[in-house]
Regions:
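Short loop/beta submotifs within extracellular cysteine-rich repeat domains
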Residues: 4, 28-31, 39-41, 61, ...
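Short proline/glycine- and polar residue-rich coil/turn motifs
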Residues: 11-16, 46-49
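Alpha-helical segments with a strong preference for the paired helices of cellulosomal dockerin domains
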Residues: 66-116, 126-177
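Short, surface-exposed beta-strand/turn "edge" patches of beta-sheet domains
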Residues: 34-50, 153-157
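Surface-exposed interfaces of beta-sheet-rich extracellular modules
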Residues: 16-43
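Conserved "repeat-terminator" motif of extracellular CCP/Sushi domains
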Residues: 23, 42-59
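Short, recurring structural edge motifs at helix starts
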Residues: 5-10, 20-22, 59-72, 117-129
Protein backbone atom coordinates (compact mmCIF):
# COMPACT_ATOMS: atom_id res chain seq x y z
CA UNK A 1 0.00 0.00 0.00
CA UNK A 2 0.84 3.68 0.07
CA UNK A 3 1.70 3.64 3.76
CA UNK A 4 0.30 3.24 7.24
CA UNK A 5 -0.58 5.24 10.33
CA UNK A 6 0.75 4.62 13.80
CA UNK A 7 -0.50 6.34 16.95
CA UNK A 8 1.36 6.53 20.27
CA UNK A 9 0.19 5.66 22.78
CA UNK A 10 -2.37 3.22 21.44
CA UNK A 11 -4.65 2.49 23.18
CA UNK A 12 -5.04 5.89 24.83
CA UNK A 13 -6.02 6.25 28.47
CA UNK A 14 -9.22 8.25 28.89
CA UNK A 15 -8.48 11.97 28.97
CA UNK A 16 -4.95 11.50 27.59
CA UNK A 17 -3.48 12.48 24.24
CA UNK A 18 -2.04 10.51 21.33
CA UNK A 19 0.17 11.56 18.44
CA UNK A 20 -0.27 9.81 15.10
CA UNK A 21 2.50 9.47 12.55
CA UNK A 22 2.27 8.53 8.87
CA UNK A 23 4.77 5.96 7.61
CA UNK A 24 5.01 6.47 3.85
CA UNK A 25 5.86 3.94 1.12
CA UNK A 26 8.88 5.51 -0.66
CA UNK A 27 7.09 6.12 -3.99
CA UNK A 28 4.36 8.14 -2.29
CA UNK A 29 4.37 11.45 -0.43
CA UNK A 30 2.47 12.18 2.76
CA UNK A 31 -0.86 13.86 2.22
CA UNK A 32 -3.25 15.12 4.86
CA UNK A 33 -5.10 13.36 7.65
CA UNK A 34 -8.85 12.82 7.62
CA UNK A 35 -11.42 11.63 10.12
CA UNK A 36 -10.86 13.02 13.61
CA UNK A 37 -7.68 14.80 12.43
CA UNK A 38 -7.11 17.16 9.54
CA UNK A 39 -4.14 18.89 8.00
CA UNK A 40 -0.53 17.71 7.86
CA UNK A 41 -0.25 16.54 11.51
CA UNK A 42 -2.43 14.46 13.79
CA UNK A 43 -2.54 15.01 17.54
CA UNK A 44 -5.57 13.76 19.42
CA UNK A 45 -6.07 15.55 22.75
CA UNK A 46 -8.29 14.74 25.72
CA UNK A 47 -9.46 11.46 24.21
CA UNK A 48 -12.66 10.29 25.93
CA UNK A 49 -14.10 7.98 23.25
CA UNK A 50 -12.99 5.96 20.25
CA UNK A 51 -11.53 8.09 17.47
CA UNK A 52 -10.96 7.29 13.81
CA UNK A 53 -8.12 8.77 11.76
CA UNK A 54 -6.91 8.07 8.25
CA UNK A 55 -3.51 8.96 6.83
CA UNK A 56 -3.80 9.94 3.16
CA UNK A 57 -0.91 9.52 0.74
CA UNK A 58 -0.18 11.13 -2.62
CA UNK A 59 1.27 9.13 -5.54
CA UNK A 60 4.44 10.62 -7.04
CA UNK A 61 6.72 10.18 -10.04
CA UNK A 62 9.58 9.06 -7.75
CA UNK A 63 9.22 5.55 -9.18
CA UNK A 64 12.45 4.22 -7.67
CA UNK A 65 11.64 5.58 -4.21
CA UNK A 66 14.97 7.39 -3.97
CA UNK A 67 15.76 9.93 -1.27
CA UNK A 68 15.30 13.69 -1.54
CA UNK A 69 18.73 14.24 -3.11
CA UNK A 70 17.96 12.03 -6.12
CA UNK A 71 14.16 12.23 -6.31
CA UNK A 72 12.58 13.08 -9.69
CA UNK A 73 15.73 12.71 -11.76
CA UNK A 74 15.31 12.68 -15.56
CA UNK A 75 18.00 9.99 -16.01
CA UNK A 76 16.34 7.63 -13.53
CA UNK A 77 12.66 8.29 -12.82
CA UNK A 78 12.10 10.12 -16.11
CA UNK A 79 13.78 7.45 -18.20
CA UNK A 80 11.87 4.65 -16.46
CA UNK A 81 8.55 6.49 -16.94
CA UNK A 82 9.19 7.10 -20.66
CA UNK A 83 10.23 3.46 -21.17
CA UNK A 84 7.09 2.31 -19.37
CA UNK A 85 4.98 4.51 -21.66
CA UNK A 86 6.74 2.91 -24.64
CA UNK A 87 5.69 -0.54 -23.43
CA UNK A 88 9.10 -1.62 -22.12
CA UNK A 89 8.88 -4.11 -19.24
CA UNK A 90 11.20 -6.41 -17.32
CA UNK A 91 14.91 -5.76 -16.85
CA UNK A 92 14.98 -3.43 -19.87
CA UNK A 93 12.69 -1.03 -17.99
CA UNK A 94 15.44 -0.17 -15.49
CA UNK A 95 18.62 -0.99 -17.44
CA UNK A 96 21.16 1.79 -16.88
CA UNK A 97 18.65 3.88 -14.93
CA UNK A 98 19.58 2.87 -11.39
CA UNK A 99 20.53 5.31 -8.66
CA UNK A 100 22.27 4.71 -5.37
CA UNK A 101 19.77 4.87 -2.54
CA UNK A 102 16.79 3.70 -4.58
CA UNK A 103 14.29 1.86 -2.36
CA UNK A 104 12.51 0.22 -5.31
CA UNK A 105 14.69 -1.67 -7.78
CA UNK A 106 12.37 -4.44 -8.98
CA UNK A 107 11.16 -3.61 -12.52
CA UNK A 108 7.92 -5.54 -11.98
CA UNK A 109 7.14 -3.47 -8.86
CA UNK A 110 7.85 -0.27 -10.79
CA UNK A 111 5.63 -1.32 -13.69
CA UNK A 112 2.83 -2.25 -11.28
CA UNK A 113 3.12 1.11 -9.54
CA UNK A 114 3.13 3.04 -12.84
CA UNK A 115 0.12 1.02 -14.01
CA UNK A 116 -1.67 2.03 -10.80
CA UNK A 117 -1.17 5.72 -11.67
CA UNK A 118 -3.41 5.24 -14.71
CA UNK A 119 -4.80 8.56 -15.96
CA UNK A 120 -2.35 10.53 -13.82
CA UNK A 121 0.24 9.65 -16.50
CA UNK A 122 -1.89 11.30 -19.20
CA UNK A 123 -0.15 14.59 -18.56
CA UNK A 124 -2.01 16.60 -21.22
CA UNK A 125 -5.32 14.94 -20.31
CA UNK A 126 -6.23 13.79 -23.82
CA UNK A 127 -7.18 10.28 -22.69
CA UNK A 128 -4.14 8.36 -23.94
CA UNK A 129 -0.73 7.73 -22.39
CA UNK A 130 1.84 8.56 -25.08
CA UNK A 131 5.61 8.52 -24.55
CA UNK A 132 6.10 11.04 -27.38
CA UNK A 133 3.93 13.63 -25.63
CA UNK A 134 3.27 12.74 -21.98
CA UNK A 135 6.70 11.17 -21.55
CA UNK A 136 8.36 14.16 -23.16
CA UNK A 137 6.49 16.50 -20.82
CA UNK A 138 7.63 14.49 -17.77
CA UNK A 139 11.25 14.43 -18.95
CA UNK A 140 11.30 18.14 -19.80
CA UNK A 141 9.74 19.08 -16.47
CA UNK A 142 12.32 16.98 -14.60
CA UNK A 143 15.04 18.73 -16.61
CA UNK A 144 13.73 22.11 -15.45
CA UNK A 145 11.85 23.25 -18.56
CA UNK A 146 8.96 25.60 -17.79
CA UNK A 147 6.58 27.79 -19.76
CA UNK A 148 6.46 27.52 -23.55
CA UNK A 149 9.71 25.52 -23.60
CA UNK A 150 7.97 22.78 -21.61
CA UNK A 151 5.01 22.31 -23.95
CA UNK A 152 6.50 23.19 -27.38
CA UNK A 153 5.55 20.36 -29.79
CA UNK A 154 4.83 18.10 -26.82
CA UNK A 155 1.04 18.09 -26.53
CA UNK A 156 -1.11 15.23 -27.73
CA UNK A 157 -4.08 15.58 -30.06
CA UNK A 158 -7.21 17.42 -28.97
CA UNK A 159 -9.45 17.28 -27.12
CA UNK A 160 -7.13 17.86 -24.16
CA UNK A 161 -7.95 18.76 -20.58
CA UNK A 162 -4.60 20.53 -20.14
CA UNK A 163 -3.19 22.61 -23.00
CA UNK A 164 -1.28 25.48 -21.41
CA UNK A 165 2.09 25.49 -19.71
CA UNK A 166 0.44 26.65 -16.48
CA UNK A 167 -1.97 23.68 -16.53
CA UNK A 168 0.75 21.16 -17.40
CA UNK A 169 3.13 22.55 -14.76
CA UNK A 170 0.42 22.36 -12.08
CA UNK A 171 -0.38 18.75 -12.99
CA UNK A 172 3.28 17.72 -12.88
CA UNK A 173 3.99 19.68 -9.69
CA UNK A 174 1.20 17.72 -7.98
CA UNK A 175 2.93 14.47 -9.02
CA UNK A 176 6.32 15.72 -7.79
CA UNK A 177 5.68 17.28 -4.37
Amino acid sequence: GAGAASCTPNPVNEGSSSTCTAVVNPVYAPGNWSGDCSGPTCILTNVTAARSVTANFVPTLNVDGSDAASRYQPVTDGQIIVRYMQGVRGAALVAGAGVAGAMVTDPAAMATYLYSLGAKLVIDGNGAIDAATDGLLVARYMLGFRGDALIANALGPTPRVRSTAVEIEAWLAALMP
